[in-house]
Amino acid sequence: MNIQFSKMHGLGNDFMVIDNVTQNVFLSKDTISRLADRNFGIGFDQLLMIEPPYDPELDFHYRIFNADGSEVEQCGNGARCFARFVKMKGLTQKRIINVSTAKGKIQLKIEHDGNITVDMGKPILEPAKVPFEAQKEEKTYILRVEDHTVLCGVVSIGNPHCVVLVDDIDNAPVETLGPLLENHERFPNKVNVGFLEIKSRDHARLRVWERGVGETLACGTGACAAAVVGQLQDKLNPHCTIELPGGELRLFWQPGQSVKMTGTADFVFDGQIQI
């Protein structure tokens, strides 16, 4: 099987993007994992699969697979790349694109400056729906990790996130605490872990340990989760900039509303591979 694909990235969070509207591609979990290998494959953080809409009122459906081959519910940086891809490839002429994912519906808007705004939907704070094991909804939760106590915020942006505030992002224990929290027993579906340093009420720095991937240069849903948790803990304003290793995202959220994220999406190259 010969597969046409594109390589794209959002702030360094990189993707293999496959048009499954004009192709008929099925990839096993093992095949995706092999393609994700940066030495022996294409190399990517996630694979995005664009498909025809399941709902006639929507424009597309898209699926997201991590580098380990597992399918996940949502990806903010991937959503921006999705929007640029379908416009660039002539799959749509619309500037406002409505799509479905495994977790629900999102709206993408291609701005006149080329940036893309994603309406990520309302954040989920109810523990059982994240899912997260807790007696009741709190702004801050206490987790026991080995011999340590960790304070964190927990939210779902279509996928689960745990956000830990730190004083110094450059020395945050991302590679040690990240995988421990990812696999913590109170997160039955595992969790993405964000380490957040507040610089001001309008600006914060973030590093993310992504579930099934490891640390990435950027995580769109992680930035959304950080903006929500930062505001719930009275650290951030509704409009704020989240700075990730790969670049900046602009966020807007008010309680009871959808989270809106604006940022870039970059095309790298087109290719084909024989499977």
Curated annotation (Swiss-Prot):
Gene name per UniProt: dapF
First-level EC class: isomerase
Organism: Psychromonas ingrahamii (strain DSM 17664 / CCUG 51855 / 37)
Entry annotation: catalytic residues: 75 (proton donor), 219 (proton acceptor)
Pathway membership, UniProt: Amino-acid biosynthesis; L-lysine biosynthesis via DAP pathway; DL-2,6-diaminopimelate from LL-2,6-diaminopimelate: step 1/1
Entry EC number(s): 5.1.1.7
Task of the protein: Catalyzes the stereoinversion of LL-2,6-diaminopimelate (L,L-DAP) to meso-diaminopimelate (meso-DAP), a precursor of L-lysine and an essential component of the bacterial peptidoglycan.
GO biological process: lysine biosynthetic process via diaminopimelate
Keyword Transferase: no
Binding site for substrate: 13, 46, 66, 76-77, 159, 192, 210-211, 220-221
UniProt xrefs under HAMAP family: DAP_epimerase
Location relative to the cell: Cytoplasm
Reactions mediated catalytically: (2S,6S)-2,6-diaminopimelate = meso-2,6-diaminopimelate
This protein's record includes keyword Cytoplasm: yes
PROSITE patterns given in the database record: DAP_EPIMERASE
GO cellular component labels: cytosol
This protein's name: Diaminopimelate epimerase
